[in-house]
Every structure is written in C-alpha cells, then in structure tokens.
C-alpha cells in the first residue's frame, strides 16, 4: 500500500493585480478534482490524503501568461483540460503489454498535448486572448512510480532523507545559456532574459513535453511550484522549511508563501507538496536520485537515465 498526503495553495503575491497561477489535485478512481478557487484576498491550503491505486493520482502547477485575464484563462484551461482528459475512457488497451506500466504518463502526456492545442486555438481565434500561454508541470502517482511531465519552467523538487534535489530542468533561455557554459547560474538570476521560456502551452501548435519517472522512497516529499516561489526562495530554504515542518506540510505551504512574499512577492506564488508513505516503498537512502527519461514516441523501449543533483 502507498499513501500520498497532499497540500496545495496559490497566492496572488504582493504586487500583481490578479492570480494567473493554478494547480490541480486529481484522484482518478474517485473522479474528483481540486483546483485553485480562492479569492485574491484569501489564503487557503487545500489538503487531501489518498491511497495510490492503479488508476493514479495526478498533481500539477500551471503558470499563466498573456496580460489582462489571458494568463488566468490559460492556466485554468490547462488544469481543467488535463483533468477532463484523464477522466475519460482509459486508453490503456491501445498500449503494448510492455507499456502497460506507463499508462498514466501516456494519458498525462496526451492530455497535456490536447491542452496545448486548446489554449493555442483560443489564443489564435479570440483577440482578447491573443498570445496567451501557460507552463505546465505535473506528476502522476501509481504503484509503479512517480511520473513527471514538464512544459516551461515551473519546477519539481524532491526532498529525500533531509536533502533537496531539483528533478526538472527549466525550459528557459537562461538555462540553455547555463548548459552552454555561456553564463553561470548566479548570472542567470539577474539576466535580462531571465523570464524567456522555450516552450509553453498555447505558444505554438506543437509542444514537446519532457517526461520522466522517479522510483519513490518512503517519506519522499515532492514539491511542484511556479517561478513566483522558486525565484524568491532558495533551494536551501525550501529544504529547511519542508524538513522543519515534515509532520505538518500544510504549515510548510504557508511558510513557503510567506518567505516568497517577504522576499518581494512580485509574482503569483503556487506550491503543491506531496508526501509518500507506505509498506510497498523502499526506505529512504543516500544513493543518487535516478530519473528514467521516457521516450513517449516509443514508450516501451529502455529509457535513458539521468541523475538529479543535491542542491
């Protein structure tokens, strides 16, 4: 048995006039979903606990962009479309037997692609939404593992055995420059093109989501967030706040938002935290965190391996 304890919140921050972020909590077996619905002046932490079964539990963060109400519409379209598509008839029968263990990431991938098409079409045909888009970073939990999908620069972190790992890579121009060794990570923090991302839902008709799988350990804490959090709270402080509140992660959500606002709060702030427990999970260890990169074009083939680094 595997259980997942979930806490999520979204906050307008201190500067923005509206909240263009959104989050998703989805229990597929129960056909129940939760998204950010609080008013701009409210602060609410949504908390749920589920047993993870073969149908899976999905979490996501989406950061909208586009001005006026366009960003808010884009992120809501993203989480709503993904939720609706995942609750439709199961396409598992179309997969090969070897691929059946990947049924949730296949569904999540297809739902993300469909969300992109809908956001892109809305922006193309409706002048008030022209140019709108949204990031989308999601996680799917099944007994086979934790599946991760990413479009844009909303991040996923893992806190394991008191250490923190960034398990996604920003799909951004400055990250590309870092990879090419043209700038340092420190220089990226103040780079004039810091906010330029390489892909987003709605920006183009075609997207290429990055997909991966993590083998979870007992007491792993997974964290999804928009850049309103990751730009304002260092990895070390993320780790400290999560570890200090490991027995009350709803408080960790509140403390993370408070920290981001204390450091300026110029952007909307969204965070989803999930803690895994259960007899079927490996005990936490200090080994390297291995990510299995999944080729969605040939899903049953042996996937590449990547390693997450301690931050």
Annotate each predicted stretch with a short phrase.
Residues 1-311:
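PP2C/PPM-type serine/threonine phosphatase catalytic domain
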């Amino acid at each position: 048995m595997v259980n997942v304890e979930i806490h999520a919140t979204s906050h307008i921050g201190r500067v923005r006039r509206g909240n263009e972020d959104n989050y998703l909590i989805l229990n597929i077996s129960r056909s129940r979903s939760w998204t950010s619905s609080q008013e701009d002046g409210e602060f609410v932490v949504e908390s749920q606990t589920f047993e993870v079964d073969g149908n899976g539990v999905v979490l996501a963060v989406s950061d909208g962009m586009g001005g006026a109400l366009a960003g808010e519409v884009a992120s809501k379209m993203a989480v709503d479309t993904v939720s609706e598509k995942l609750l439709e008839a199961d396409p598992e029968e179309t997969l090969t037997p070897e691929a059946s263990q990947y049924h949730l990431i296949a569904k999540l991938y297809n739902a993300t692609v469909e969300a992109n098409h809908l956001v892109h079409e809305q922006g193309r045909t409706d002048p008030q939404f022209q140019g709108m888009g949204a990031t989308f970073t999601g996680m799917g939990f099944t007994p086979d593992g934790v599946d991760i999908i990413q479009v844009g620069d909303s991040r996923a972190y893992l806190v394991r055995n008191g250490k923190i790992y960034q398990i996604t890579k920003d799909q951004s121009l400055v990250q590309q420059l870092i990879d090419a060794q043209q700038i340092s990570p420190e220089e990226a923090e103040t780079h004039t093109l810091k906010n330029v991302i390489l892909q987003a839902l709605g920006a183009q008709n075609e997207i290429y989501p990055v997909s991966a799988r993590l083998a979870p350990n007992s007491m792993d804490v997974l964290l999804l967030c928009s850049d309103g959090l990751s730009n304002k709270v260092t990895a070390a402080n993320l780790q400290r706040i999560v570890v200090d509140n490991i027995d009350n992660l709803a408080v960790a959500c509140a403390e993370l938002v408070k920290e981001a606002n204390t450091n300026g709060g110029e952007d909307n702030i969204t965070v989803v935290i999930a803690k895994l427990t259960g007899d079927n999970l490996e005990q936490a260890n200090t080994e390297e965190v291995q990510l299995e990169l999944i080729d969605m074009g040939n899903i049953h083939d042996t996937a590449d391996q990547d390693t997450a680094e301690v931050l």
